[in-house]
Amino acid sequence: MENIPPKVQNQLAMLQQLQQQLQTVAAQKTQYEMAIRESRRAQEELKDIPEDAEIFVNVGTVMMQEKKPREVASLAEKVETLELRVKSLEKQEKAMQARFEQLSTDIKGSLDRKKPPVPPTAE
């Protein structure tokens, strides 16, 4: 690392940080997508039961009775909110990926310019 210019060292550090941020965003997106699938599965289950059926909902470690229309509305709102979060994360991910690629290209260009020319081999 000692023969790499400080500017390139800083760019490498930024690249590593950006890579970690990309991994974090991807993990969050995966969690939200799983929550969406789970909520949609619950919505499908609720379609098959009568409007006046007893429904129980987990609230932390407690199960509470809830009216079906209220829970259906709650699930719809939850899915909508999660979908918005996923879209936001996708935008962030796309911007970060573009920045990552640009930074990678800049670093490669800087390192290629710094390399001494390879002498021709004698045959």
Question: Which role fits each region the language model picked out?
Answer:
Residues 45-71:
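Short coil/loop "hinge" linkers that interrupt or connect long alpha-helical coiled-coils or helical hairpins
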Residues 27-33, 63, 69, 119-120:
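Extended, charged amphipathic alpha-helical "stalk" segments
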Residues 8, 25, 57-62, 72, ...:
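Extended aliphatic helical segments
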